[in-house]
Amino acid sequence: MKQFTSLSRVPQAALAALILGAVLLPSSSSPAQADQPLPSINLPIEGWTVVALKKGFLQEEYNKLGTKVNLVDPGTTQLIGAESALLDRGGLAIAQRMIYPATVHKANGIDASIVWLSTKSSEYRTPVLALKSSGLNSIADLKDKNFGSSRVACGWTSPTEIFTAAGLPLDNARERGQVRYTNISNTVATSAALLSGRIDATSTHVALPDVAALIETDEVKVIGRSPADGVYVNNAGRVAYFVMREFVDAHPQAIVAFLRAREKTDAWINANVDEAAAIIAKETRIPVAIARFGITDPSSFQYMQGEPSSQVAVDAIKTFQKWYIDHGDDILSSRHLSDDTIESFVDKRFFKGGEYSVYQD
């Protein structure tokens, strides 16, 4: 069966409306029998998925199910959080975010399950950045300055811990802190705000193409990092793949196919970095040097090992949820997940020892 890539880009206003609808409307999912026919599946365009399609790893797995693969732009670079709307409306079968925003989506009413989690994050992934020419050299220099990032993302979770550790808390919905905070839900707009001086510093994934370009051109510098033993690195900064519960119950083998293809592709990319970077550059329209940076830099997040233990996943959510609530998280304070909900949020069938696990016992 022929495979093809479909690139779908949605206007920002439409994405915002979709997200609002995804949050406000209750889920109508109901139990379904496993392994229902699946003629096609929409997967997110990522560095590894474009390589997997080009090299045939996705086709190898999905041809066994008679399923055609479409790669779809999840819209996250246009509007952070867009993937939740696409997931809820059926435009995307599997979404990828860090575990904190995935948990916020769950708290906002998305009936989704985590089917894969990465091992712990890194202090290099989401540092605090300032312009090289700014004169700002440490977190202490940001007192009463303007910090901007995406609220429901690592651009908030990582710096919240960094600033708290430095005794300079960010503004939050409850009280004024010692650093002004602006929510900017677009990675390109965040970079533009930093370059134009509208904000003094930001925090985001260094491996994202627009941010990697600022690093490679020596326009920004790191002035603070997440504690290596902290809540972000060990818990909130883990990568998660999550799926609507109705879909995963109906098509568990489609999830297994995705996870198997990911493992094969990740191994191939690590062994063939230059060829992989060339494929990613061509398919996602970024410079080869930036594609290579996204693979090899310590901040990389798309090519991590999986966390086999479902208990570690459950404990990670419980740990970071409590920590952020204790430190002014207005979202999870009002809509936090119960222990029972967290237990069911992590679909143990896809972790080690589970019925659909890709991990060897």
Indicate where each model-derived feature is located:
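Bacterial N-terminal signal peptides that target proteins for export
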Residues: 2-15
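Bacterial N-terminal signal peptides
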Residues: 13-26
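Sec/Tat signal peptide C-region and signal peptidase I cleavage site
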Residues: 28-33
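Short, glycine-/small- and polar/acidic-enriched structural segments
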Residues: 35-184, 200, 206, 224
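Short, solvent-exposed loop/beta-turn-alpha elements that line the ligand-binding surface or hinge
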Residues: 59-69, 227-234, 301-314
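Pocket-lining segment of extracytoplasmic ligand-binding domains
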Residues: 100, 178, 182, 186-283
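Secondary-structure end/capping motifs
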Residues: 249-331
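Conserved C-terminal helix/tail region of periplasmic/extracytoplasmic solute-binding proteins
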Residues: 321-361
